[in-house]
Every structure is written in structure tokens, then in C-alpha cells.
Amino acid sequence: MRTFVRGTAVWGVECPQRPSRVAGVTMAGFRVSDLEALRIVPHPAVTLLVEFGAGSSVLDCAAGRQEWGSIVSGPGLGTGGAVRAWGKNVECVQIRLSPVIARAILGASPADLDGAVVSLGDLWGREASWIREQLGDVSSWQDRFELTDALLARRHETGPPVDPEVAWAWHRIVVSRGLTRVDRLAVEVGWSRKRLWSRFRSQLGLPPKRAVKLVRFDHAAHRLVAGEAAAQVAADTGYADQSHLHRDVMAFTGATPATVAGELFLAVDDIAWPGCG
């Protein structure tokens, strides 16, 4: 387990030695003794947090709402900068699901989340308690990843797939790092614009235009954390100018690009998921 230290924050981070058997699944393990007011930065994935240790975390969400323990969040959670995480002695496996496979694994459409947070137990019932107990019963992080991956694979096999056209459109957005022209997507899949927008939104949880913005922002944010100048990041990632980048970063995080460049969430992110940006 790698240790990441910044100021008083100490994080233990573990990564799987093998990729998931399900394309679109990535995982990391975390051990955090003191989690204090961590700003949640939006990410283009559905996130599952499975806690198993003695401690627990809490998410402070919009309008004073809180969620404790193991949770599921839709793509873009944290937009606007209002979501914070707190906790003591937290141990968890965090799973990121491509929205393309999220519906099959969750048993519900990401559209039902719409950037919000729900308890994992609300979606998985007894299976949520079962995986939490299993993770707590083993001492090896690699065994925890294997247990989690086996469960995800089983659920994926029996869950409903998204339309191939929707999966293809998402893939185009991701591989282009948000530089795809959304008006071309419908033409390229041979659907009407209305049909693609409706299917994309209902199956992946966000409309194509928002997906493009989120993927582009995610790539730009990780480059800012890597120390690149905002003007260069804006030029390289498809923003009209530095002011455009500034507005987008503010909209997604409630903070300036300079502040985002120092965000603990993103710094740890680059250790847990190297190359994700």
C-alpha cells in the first residue's frame, strides 16, 4: 500500500495487480485515518464506495442532505463544488464504472441517480451487506479486489446492456477527451438527434452535451494537477481560451483553476488511477 501525505492528510492507497474481468471497471483501495472536508470533484463515471472497516465516512450533499457508509453516485457528483466528504478510520474499496456498464451492474439506470448519491444497500439489498462482510473478513487487498470483481462480473453477466449505438457514442466522447462534436454523433450512429439524446440520457444518466463537457473538464483538471499552465491546458483541451476554461472549472467545482490544481481529491486520484486523466 502506497502512502500519500499532504499536510495533515495521510492516505493509504492500494491498486489491483490485475485488470478487472469486466471492461469499464476500475478499482482502488483506501485507508484514511482522518478525512476532513474533502471536496468531491466531478468525474465521468458511476462511483461505488464499499466500506468495510470500523470507521465510516459521510458525504455532505446539496441542501444539507447526508449519506453515510457505502454509497453509489452518478456521473458528475460534486458539480458546483457543494459536496464534501468527512470520516475517521475509513477503509473502503472504491469502484468506478463506465456508464455503459453501470446499468447492468447496478440493476438500475444511472439516470435514476442524476448526479446524486444513494445508499448501496438501496440498490443491492442483502448483497451490499454480504460484500461488506466479505471484504472485512480478508486481510489482503488483492483478495478484496478479487472478491469485488467476482461480484461485479456476476451482476454484469445478468444485467441489461445499453444500446450499441449509445455505447459507441460514449466511446467516441471518451477517446476524443471531450473534443467530439455532439451534433455529429447522431449522424454517425444513424439515429435522429432526438432519439440518440433520449436513449443516451435514459441509459447513461446524462445527455451527450453534458458528457462531452464532463470528459473534457476531467482531462483538463488532471493536467492542471500535473502542474501545467492554465493557458496551455485551455489551448490543448478544446477550450476557446483561458477564460472559457476558468468558467468551466468554476461551474464544475466552485473553485478557480489554481485552486483545483492543488485539490487533494485529484492528487490522490492520480495515484489510485494512474493515467486516468
Task: Please report, for each region that a protein language model flagged, where it lies by residue.
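DNA major-groove recognition helix of helix-turn-helix
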Residues: 200, 212, 249, 261
